[in-house]
Amino acid sequence: MSPRKFFVGGNWKMNGDKKSLGELINTLNSGKMNADTEVVCGAPAIYLDFARQKLDAKIALSAQNCYKVAKGAFTGEISPAMIKDCGATWVILGHSERRHVFGECDELIGQKVAHALSEGIGVIACIGEKLDQREAGITEKVVFEQTKAIADNVKDWSKVVLAYEPVWAIGTGKTATPEQAQEVHKKLREWVKTNVSEGVAQSVRIIYGGSVTGGTCRELAGQPDIDGFLVGGASLKPEFIEIINAKH
């Protein structure tokens, strides 16, 4: 059996209000969840406090982004210190929407990772290729470059989860086949073994994101190098509980 604790993160993105998120949280709190799975919900920054007050202690809270310094004249940004102050213990960094909609580069993402970890926040670090990159046969090159920019900024890997999300499968309804996902996860683990250490390669959780649903989660969860999921749209629905229990 894998010594790695299964990890399921829900990324609510820019969705919900107090009413709908409150209802979702009630559903999650009363749902039966596999105790061997680590569960984290990524709320919009403005609702972090609200979510932490309502979520059961068994469910951790994540921010969806943060900046690379603790405070200052950075209008519209939030810092890991603020995230911690709201009771959140994780942050999602390098999500494909941050990279491709907001133009964040590998270097900036690396700096954010370093600062969040230095403040004691866990990082869900996202990597993944676009459709044209997969079709050009450069998936590994792209994903390894993104991973290197993150790895160069990590001293303690115990607080890092790597999330592989093929960009072409996010919100498109296209899912990588379990075999396609496993292939990239396996190569990522080999990259970590070669470039970081064998110990980290065996312990780091590499989770999959990209149109994960109640219907696709079990077969994906059965792959040896898939240690969980980062779930988008389905994390706003009751089926999120099915996904949490994919390993059950």
From Swiss-Prot:
Disulfide bonds: none
A Pfam family reported for this protein in Swiss-Prot or TrEMBL: TIM
Active site positions, chain numbering: 95 (electrophile), 165 (proton acceptor)
Regions annotated as coiled coil: none
Bilayer-spanning residue ranges: none
One Gene Ontology molecular-function label: protein homodimerization activity
GO biological process: gluconeogenesis; glyceraldehyde-3-phosphate biosynthetic process; glycerol catabolic process; glycolytic process; methylglyoxal biosynthetic process
GO annotations of cellular component type: cytosol
InterPro entries: Aldolase_TIM, TIM_sf, TrioseP_Isoase_bac/euk, Triosephosphate_isomerase, Triosephosphate_isomerase_AS
Residues binding substrate: 11, 13
EC number: 5.3.1.1, 4.2.3.3
Localization annotation: Cytoplasm
Keyword annotations of the record: Cytoplasm, Gluconeogenesis, Glycolysis, Isomerase, Lyase
Complexes and interactors: Homodimer.
PANTHER family, A to Z: TRIOSEPHOSPHATE ISOMERASE
Described function: Triosephosphate isomerase is an extremely efficient metabolic enzyme that catalyzes the interconversion between dihydroxyacetone phosphate (DHAP) and D-glyceraldehyde-3-phosphate (G3P) in glycolysis and gluconeogenesis. It is also responsible for the non-negligible production of methylglyoxal a reactive cytotoxic side-product that modifies and can alter proteins, DNA and lipids.
Stated family: Belongs to the triosephosphate isomerase family.
Entry protein name: Triosephosphate isomerase
Gene coding for it: tpi1
